[in-house]
């Protein structure tokens, strides 16, 4: 019935990297729950800071958290006050030494999570769902996307029967594994209930690095 595999999960290990990099045996469940707690806490604390990806790397009694954000100044704060407070709270939450790296997202209009978040917030402010999607598509294409597809589903305009409506521009080759496709889904809380927002952005092909050949072979 036209179900789609998760575009990022399909490409992990091929052109995408893992968001969590660590190995564990007996502690696996504890680390996994700790990761979930860290992500939930950061998303709550930095809800307005346009945080997209949260990468977690573990060493012995040390956790390295990389935050990909479109607003690094808001995350860092005046003289680093915000990031210091966040680090202290994460140290307390995990009981381990937490290091925080801030990675700036140069083009937020090419990040599916941030685009979906923008559409969802507009829907909560009663912006027409068609207009919100079309504006997001225009911004992404202007920023250099090769293709973009969006979908909003739920009780659109307060209709009694829920439905899904989407728009697309350019190409979004979901079956091409070397295609760099970013995907995200968000939720908008409206007076009529929740609306689901899905975004696929095709940013071009990622070609594997050429291997060095000896003897001209």
UniProtKB/Swiss-Prot annotation:
Question: What GO terms describe the biological role, i.e. biological process, of this protein?
Answer: translation
Q: Which CDD domains match?
A: KH-II_30S_S3
Q: What Gene3D superfamilies is this protein classified in?
A: 3.30.300.20, Ribosomal protein S3, C-terminal domain
Q: Which keywords accompany this UniProt record?
A: Ribonucleoprotein, Ribosomal protein, RNA-binding, rRNA-binding
Task: Read off the InterPro entries from this record.
Answer: KH_dom (IPR004087), KH_dom-like_a/b (IPR015946), KH_dom_type_2 (IPR004044), KH_sf_prok-type (IPR009019), Ribosomal_S3_C_sf (IPR036419), Ribosomal_uS3_bac-typ (IPR005704), Ribosomal_uS3_C (IPR001351), Ribosomal_uS3_CS (IPR018280)
| Family per similarity comment | Belongs to the universal ribosomal protein uS3 family.
**Assembly and binders:** Part of the 30S ribosomal subunit. Forms a tight complex with proteins S10 and S14.
Record's protein name: Small ribosomal subunit protein uS3
The source organism is Streptococcus thermophilus (strain ATCC BAA-250 / LMG 18311)
């Amino acid at each position: 019935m036209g179900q789609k595999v998760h575009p990022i999960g399909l490409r992990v290990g091929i052109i995408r990297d893992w968001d969590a990099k660590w190995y564990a045996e007996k502690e696996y469940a504890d680390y996994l729950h700790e990761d979930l707690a860290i992500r939930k806490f950061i998303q709550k604390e930095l809800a307005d800071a346009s945080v997209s990806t949260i990468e977690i790397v573990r060493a012995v009694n040390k956790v390295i958290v990389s935050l990909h954000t479109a607003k690094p100044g808001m995350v860092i704060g005046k003289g680093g006050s915000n990031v210091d407070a966040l680090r202290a709270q994460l140290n307390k939450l995990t009981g381990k030494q937490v290091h925080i790296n801030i990675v700036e997202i140069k083009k937020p209009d090419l990040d599916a999570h941030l685009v979906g978040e923008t559409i969802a917030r507009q829907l909560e402010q009663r912006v027409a769902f068609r207009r919100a999607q079309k504006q997001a598509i225009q911004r992404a294409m202007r920023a250099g996307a090769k293709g973009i597809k969006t979908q909003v589903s739920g009780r659109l305009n307060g209709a009694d029967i829920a439905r899904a409506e989407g728009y697309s521009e350019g190409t979004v080759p979901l079956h091409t594994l070397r295609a760099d496709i970013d995907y995200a889904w968000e939720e908008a809380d409206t007076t009529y209930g929740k609306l689901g927002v899905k975004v696929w952005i095709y940013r071009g092909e990622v070609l594997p690095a050429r291997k060095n050949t000896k003897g001209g072979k």
